[in-house]
Amino acid sequence: MREASARAVAWSAAAGVLLVAVLLVSATIGPEPITLRTVAMAALTELAVPVGASVTMHTHAVPVVSGGLPWPALTIAYAAPLQFGVPETAQVIVGTIRLPRIVLGATVGASLAISGAVLQGFFRNPMADPSIVGVSSGAAVGAVAAITLPSVVVIGVQPAAFAGALIAAFTVYAIATKNGHTPTATLLLSGVAVQTLLGAVTSFLVVNSGREIRPAMYWLMGTLHGSRWHDVEAALPVVVVGSAVLLAYAREMNVLLAGEEDAHTLGVDVDRTKRLLLAVASVVTAAAVSFAGAIGFVGLIVPHAVRLVVGPDHRVLLPVSALTGGAFLVAADTVARATATEPPVGIITALIGAPFFLYLLRDREVRAL
């Protein structure tokens, strides 16, 4: 137990250092280059290194196409924040434009990676990812409907995507459940069927979207463009709380790897644990895709690669996957921002992830031979 805890701390610390380094370097890159020192001071000023602080819970109206929907968020009121004398232009660029996008990217990447790690263990299949239970396709239907039919779906893009993701995930679960038992194979096949159906609905909406096809396609490809602090305030609490719950069930996930019968023998309530893991992973993924769109490969490639390095122990795998996923998505978005056309980050993750994943598969096959 102590050895596993020590490994988790060591690997998490290393991944945390990597994440911070990627965040800082990413903030220096853009049309207006800014030095690393200025970025660090601007970040400290924006995040306000405080003498004191108070935290309050409130509801925030998420920006929508039409109408509005209250969304729980946290407000941190700082007392006497320290100032670092950063030029006003640099402070605006870093604090208002780059940092919200970078922090949201890290949040989304972490949520997709930790959900992917959980679902790969859940299905005992390294090819599983958050989209396998219909979360991404459900979010796509909700978001595209809100974009193309704002007079019908009046709650807006992010709330519609979040609701669509959860409805799809729990529909998959309801279809696969019989007499209180949910076979993993049935759940997997139900997810594929629902995902295919929702993909057809999304395609129909896009084909008939007219002038709204561009924003719909951008959302479907995944983008962090235009991210602001209120997006971070809405997404971060959901991801943090959900990730904490998943980490608390790391031991049960380790036991489930041995098989459901062995897990029963060792005192794990298998059906209850599976329901909880699926629900929380779906909520965490929904919070991510509702703000960033359908970004692929993060939840597939990151936990798979991390597992090859740190092993299958979820006490180590989950935190390291989350931190590495955040770093990976921020790095991919930095590449997107550095190009002249600034493509959606989902294109970059696919270009990076697909060849790397094929390499991993080929490498494993060669070793097996």
UniProtKB/Swiss-Prot annotation:
Quick one: where is this thing mainly located?
membrane
Q: Which UniProt keywords apply?
A: Cell membrane, Membrane, Transmembrane, Transmembrane helix, Transport
| GO terms for cellular component | plasma membrane
Q: Which Pfam families match?
A: FecCD
Q: Which InterPro entries match?
A: ABC_BtuC-like, ABC_transptr_permease_BtuC
Q: Where in the cell is it found?
A: Cell membrane
SUPFAM superfamilies (alphabetical): ABC transporter involved in vitamin B12 uptake, BtuC (SSF81345)
Q: Name one GO molecular function term.
A: transmembrane transporter activity
Note the topology in the membrane.
Multi-pass membrane protein
Any transmembrane segments, and where?
Answer: 9-29, 62-82, 102-122, 130-150, 152-172, 187-207, 229-249, 283-303, 316-336, 341-361
- The family this protein is said to belong to: Belongs to the binding-protein-dependent transport system permease family. FecCD subfamily.
Oligomer and partners = The complex is composed of two ATP-binding proteins (BtuD), two transmembrane proteins (BtuC) and a solute-binding protein (BtuF).
Described function: Required for corrinoid utilization. Probably part of the ABC transporter complex BtuCDF involved in cobalamin (vitamin B12) import. Probably involved in the translocation of the substrate across the membrane.
**Name recorded for this polypeptide:** Cobalamin import system permease protein BtuC
**UniProt organism field:** Halobacterium salinarum (strain ATCC 700922 / JCM 11081 / NRC-1) (Halobacterium halobium)
